Amino acid sequence: MGASDPEVAPWARGGAAGMAGAGAGAGARGGAAAGVEARARDPPPAHRAHPRHPRPAAQPSARRMDGGSGGLGSGDNAPTTEALFVALGAGVTALSHPLLYVKLLIQVGHEPMPPTLGTNVLGRKVLYLPSFFTYAKYIVQVDGKIGLFRGLSPRLMSNALSTVTRGSMKKVFPPDEIEQVSNKDDMKTSLKKVVKETSYEMMMQCVSRMLAHPLHVISMRCMVQFVGREAKYSGVLSSIGKIFKEEGLLGFFVGLIPHLLGDVVFLWGCNLLAHFINAYLVDDSVSDTPGGLGNDQNPGSQFSQALAIRSYTKFVMGIAVSMLTYPFLLVGDLMAVNNCGLQAGLPPYSPVFKSWIHCWKYLSVQGQLFRGSSLLFRRVSSGSCFALE
């Protein structure tokens, strides 16, 4: 995957984007009934409880607890919490960087090692390209272990900027309080909630993507210098100067449109699919205790099984939709390095593309729209062509 996070691996991406997908929590029917009864008499609704499913004691909402900030932290601890998020994100980014590095080199078509003959599950002879581990060993042989972390600095800065941007936006534009609904009878209300949540998440993702994309471009170009052994982009500040001098301001945003489209399609596809599956296929009345005895003895456990299923639904939908939107990621990364003076962005590795649509059509004709999506079992396709060193 080239990068995204704002680049993240599919499983991480699915978890982040699916926040709204299963936001429809359980128990809407009982809650709605209690609300109607409470409006007709005293005491207020907050003090009424469903006869079968007692309502827990009222807790302050997330917005009230953090003073309406809606950010990563709450109160005086917000800066510390946000710094912790940035630090954790930096650790994950550093650990996953070799994976992203190898993936990007495969995306641009750099195959320094010849394929090997193997057999598939049907026993047929096929040609396999080197796996991620073999490719990583090759990089270590050429550049040493430190070579696996080429381009890490701008990527760390990109992800940190994205995290801080999202946290700041939550403080400036705090999300509305979320009421959990999931019953089929409340489908219209639930769908409106999912649409509202997804729109909010889309706004944050698009803004953070646009602000962090220049650093993403620099990181991509630093990594693909491995192909031609160049040293054109050696630091963040010097890279900014080179890009601005050679390509102008637009040079920092090449490949942005396909990345934005991929993010938008992913968010809406993942959240809506998860919502409809959870609303129509997940039964809130299923108890996780035999015979349903747990409903009265432990009311809080009634919906634990349904909530667990919903969490798995979000995860699975995130992986499935991320696979479908992978071509947007590939095209965005290829455009970021295309015709920038590096060998990886010029023939024979890649033609000079006029636009990202031109790049998409070219990859589609070549059957390469999913190039780099698999890092373990990589078969040589009929339309593939790779360079040998």
Swiss-Prot record:
<dbReference type="GO" id="GO:0005741">
    <property type="term" value="C:mitochondrial outer membrane"/>
</dbReference>
<keyword id="KW-0496">Mitochondrion</keyword>
<dbReference type="GO" id="GO:0032977">
    <property type="term" value="F:membrane insertase activity"/>
</dbReference>
<keyword id="KW-1000">Mitochondrion outer membrane</keyword>
<feature type="repeat" description="Solcar 1">
    <location>
        <begin position="81"/>
        <end position="176"/>
    </location>
</feature>
<feature type="transmembrane region" description="Helical; Name=5">
    <location>
        <begin position="323"/>
        <end position="342"/>
    </location>
</feature>
<feature type="repeat" description="Solcar 2">
    <location>
        <begin position="192"/>
        <end position="280"/>
    </location>
</feature>
<dbReference type="GO" id="GO:0005739">
    <property type="term" value="C:mitochondrion"/>
</dbReference>
<dbReference type="GO" id="GO:0045161">
    <property type="term" value="P:neuronal ion channel clustering"/>
</dbReference>
<keyword id="KW-0472">Membrane</keyword>
<dbReference type="Pfam" id="PF00153">
    <property type="entry name" value="Mito_carr"/>
</dbReference>
<dbReference type="GO" id="GO:0016020">
    <property type="term" value="C:membrane"/>
</dbReference>
<comment type="subunit">
    <text>Interacts with PSEN1.</text>
</comment>
<comment type="function">
    <text>Protein insertase that mediates insertion of transmembrane proteins into the mitochondrial outer membrane. Catalyzes insertion of proteins with alpha-helical transmembrane regions, such as signal-anchored, tail-anchored and multi-pass membrane proteins. Does not mediate insertion of beta-barrel transmembrane proteins. May play a role in apoptosis.</text>
</comment>
<feature type="transmembrane region" description="Helical; Name=6">
    <location>
        <begin position="372"/>
        <end position="389"/>
    </location>
</feature>
<dbReference type="InterPro" id="IPR023395">
    <property type="entry name" value="Mt_carrier_dom_sf"/>
</dbReference>
<keyword id="KW-0488">Methylation</keyword>
<dbReference type="GO" id="GO:0043065">
    <property type="term" value="P:positive regulation of apoptotic process"/>
</dbReference>
<dbReference type="GO" id="GO:0006915">
    <property type="term" value="P:apoptotic process"/>
</dbReference>
<dbReference type="GO" id="GO:0009966">
    <property type="term" value="P:regulation of signal transduction"/>
</dbReference>
<feature type="transmembrane region" description="Helical; Name=1">
    <location>
        <begin position="94"/>
        <end position="104"/>
    </location>
</feature>
<feature type="region of interest" description="Disordered">
    <location>
        <begin position="1"/>
        <end position="76"/>
    </location>
</feature>
<feature type="topological domain" description="Cytoplasmic">
    <location>
        <begin position="230"/>
        <end position="254"/>
    </location>
</feature>
<feature type="transmembrane region" description="Helical; Name=4">
    <location>
        <begin position="255"/>
        <end position="279"/>
    </location>
</feature>
<comment type="similarity">
    <text>Belongs to the mitochondrial carrier (TC 2.A.29) family.</text>
</comment>
<feature type="topological domain" description="Mitochondrial intermembrane">
    <location>
        <begin position="177"/>
        <end position="209"/>
    </location>
</feature>
<feature type="compositionally biased region" description="Gly residues">
    <location>
        <begin position="15"/>
        <end position="33"/>
    </location>
</feature>
<keyword id="KW-0053">Apoptosis</keyword>
<dbReference type="GO" id="GO:0045040">
    <property type="term" value="P:protein insertion into mitochondrial outer membrane"/>
</dbReference>
<keyword id="KW-0813">Transport</keyword>
<feature type="transmembrane region" description="Helical; Name=2">
    <location>
        <begin position="156"/>
        <end position="176"/>
    </location>
</feature>
<feature type="topological domain" description="Mitochondrial intermembrane">
    <location>
        <begin position="1"/>
        <end position="93"/>
    </location>
</feature>
<protein>
    <recommendedName>
        <fullName>Mitochondrial carrier homolog 1</fullName>
    </recommendedName>
</protein>
<dbReference type="InterPro" id="IPR018108">
    <property type="entry name" value="Mitochondrial_sb/sol_carrier"/>
</dbReference>
<feature type="modified residue" description="Omega-N-methylarginine">
    <location>
        <position position="29"/>
    </location>
</feature>
<feature type="transmembrane region" description="Helical; Name=3">
    <location>
        <begin position="210"/>
        <end position="229"/>
    </location>
</feature>
<keyword id="KW-1133">Transmembrane helix</keyword>
<keyword id="KW-0812">Transmembrane</keyword>
<feature type="topological domain" description="Cytoplasmic">
    <location>
        <begin position="105"/>
        <end position="155"/>
    </location>
</feature>
<keyword id="KW-0677">Repeat</keyword>
<feature type="topological domain" description="Mitochondrial intermembrane">
    <location>
        <begin position="280"/>
        <end position="322"/>
    </location>
</feature>
<feature type="topological domain" description="Cytoplasmic">
    <location>
        <begin position="343"/>
        <end position="371"/>
    </location>
</feature>
